[in-house]
Amino acid sequence: MIELKNVSRSFDGKKVLDSFSAVFDKGGYLLKGPSGIGKTTCIMLILGLLKPDAGEIIKPEGIRFAVCFQENRLFEKETVLTNVTAVNENILEADAASAITELLPSDTLNKKAGALSGGMKRRLAVVRAMLHDSDCVILDEPFTGLNDEARTKTIAFIKEHLNGRLLIITSHDERGLNDLRAVHIDPAGD
């Protein structure tokens, strides 16, 4: 379980989160709000990449996160297959390849990640996060750049590979995510 208690965070004097509280237990959550409201800031606080100005963040000691950031952070010079096997030493190459080909064509397995299109890179980043050995998966705007068909397949892939872990997705587009528990971020000061 991850809990945020009255968390506030400002940047350059502008308050982004103001006394925000939420509890994330096992299962899936959709962190909702319009673009620029503070969803990514909330994620960065949960991950410990930012510190709150006020409030408290409670999470289990040693919790392992798998993250798909808004910007694809892939090993561009490595193959698609290596990008996935590198984050989980327990996964067999055949299992990784099978999972990858649920979202990407099989002829991409041995291509360099840097050679993929933007949408393919996004799907690879999601596969890598979902196959990472973790307790909590965080996907920050995972559907950016995906057409409707790729989005639908990616949502199904995420749900299939959740395996009882905590999932936090940020998205301004809720299509296909109505079974996730919604956590709303309101404008700071409201």
PLM feature spans:
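Conserved ABC ATPase "signature" region
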Residues: 93-109
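Hydrophobic anchor residue at the start of the ABC signature
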Residues: 126
